[in-house]
């Protein structure tokens, strides 16, 4: 598929969003919106946030349990109406009565409720990390609703092999940086900690501690990245979710949407190995590898990230 030169506004500071939305009666009015989702006998509030202008792109953040706002993409908001999901169990969204129900089926159900509420026949869908698991499942279950799919630093499979590889990569990271940053000795324990046994504050502390691992060169650009690190929030309950290991490898040829796979070259957890699996299995998928980038390309290389996404969405099918 051809790429087109795209001019991206280089202002990367996000504009503040109204809460509630400027026009709560319009589902795409800028700001915060709430949808009541029927879940068993309960109605659970699902929050989402609208920013920007242009074609609609729904974005599902990672975790599970990480606050949505790390995924703000102000450069994309210059070209797209971004609809950011605030996943159930986090922030101002509701809480499930049973924490074990924070699983892929639940996240997919709540995502579908938002897309239905938008009243659009189809949308572009972007999923980051765990949000990419949700996006893959949604594109398979609701193919008619997804015009374009952007799978960003994610994987088609988890389970023992996936986590063993992530731990091994984090161990290598710790060895490389142990002399200058002795605190990295605690990082593997943080990655493998039972966050569901902690408070939200404790889970947040773990996430902020291991954050440098998610960057290509955190300490070399610490003045840039430290403010974002300090605003990260982790909610403990979603880590209690139960369900089978995620694995859609055999289903990927059934994805009908145009698909872009984006991956940071140095992503330790959802790196090129997993991105290539998706790229090779999804018919016609494109692969973009962001140089000198870890798991957070929209923060580390925002111009390159935004250019890749906008070029993909503007290119003819």
Positions of the model-derived regions?
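Catalytic active-site module of serine/aspartate enzymes centered on a nucleophile-bearing elbow/loop
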Residues: 285-317
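Flexible "cap/lid" loop of the alpha/beta hydrolase fold
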Residues: 150-192
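Active-site loop/oxyanion-hole signature of alpha/beta-hydrolase fold enzymes
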Residues: 84-126, 130, 307
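Conserved HGGG/HGGXW glycine-rich cap/lid loop of the alpha/beta-hydrolase fold
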Residues: 39, 43-95, 100
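Acidic catalytic loop of the alpha/beta-hydrolase fold
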Residues: 266-270
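Short beta-strand/loop motif that positions the catalytic acidic residue
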Residues: 255, 261-263
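Conserved hydrolase catalytic core segment
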Residues: 121-165
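Alpha/beta-hydrolase
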Residues: 170, 183-250, 257
């Amino acid at each position: 598929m051809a790429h087109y030169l795209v001019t991206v506004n280089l202002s990367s500071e996000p504009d503040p969003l109204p809460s509630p939305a400027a026009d709560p009666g319009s589902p795409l009015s800028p700001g915060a919106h709430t949808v009541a989702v029927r879940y068993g006998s309960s109605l659970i509030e699902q929050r989402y946030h609208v920013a920007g202008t242009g074609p609609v792109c729904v974005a599902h953040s990672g975790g599970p349990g990480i606050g949505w706002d790390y995924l703000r993409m102000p450069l994309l908001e210059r070209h797209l109406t971004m609809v950011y999901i605030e996943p159930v169990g986090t922030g101002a969204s509701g809480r499930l009565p049973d924490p074990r129900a924070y699983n892929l089926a639940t996240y997919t159900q709540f995502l579908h409720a938002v897309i239905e509420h938008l009243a659009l026949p189809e949308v572009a869908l972007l999923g980051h990390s765990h949000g990419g698991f949700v996006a893959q499942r949604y594109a398979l279950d609701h193919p008619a609703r997804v015009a374009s799919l952007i799978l960003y630093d994610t994987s088609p499979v988890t389970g023992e092999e996936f986590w063993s590889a992530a731990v091994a990569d984090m161990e290598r990271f710790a060895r490389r940086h142990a002399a200058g940053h002795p605190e990295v000795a605690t990082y593997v324990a943080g990655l493998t900690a039972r966050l569901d046994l902690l408070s939200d504050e404790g889970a947040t502390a773990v996430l902020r501690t291991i954050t440098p691992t998610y960057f290509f060169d955190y300490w070399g650009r610490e003045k840039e990245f430290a403010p974002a690190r300090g605003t990260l929030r982790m909610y403990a309950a979603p880590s209690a979710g139960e369900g089978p290991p995620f694995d859609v490898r055999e289903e990927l040829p059934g994805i009908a949407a145009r698909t872009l796979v984006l991956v940071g070259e140095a992503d330790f957890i959802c790196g090129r190995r997993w991105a290539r699996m998706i790229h090779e299995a999804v018919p016609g998928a494109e692969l973009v590898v962001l140089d000198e980038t870890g798991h957070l390309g929209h923060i580390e290389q925002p111009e390159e990230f935004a250019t890749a996404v906008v070029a993909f969405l503007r290119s003819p099918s």
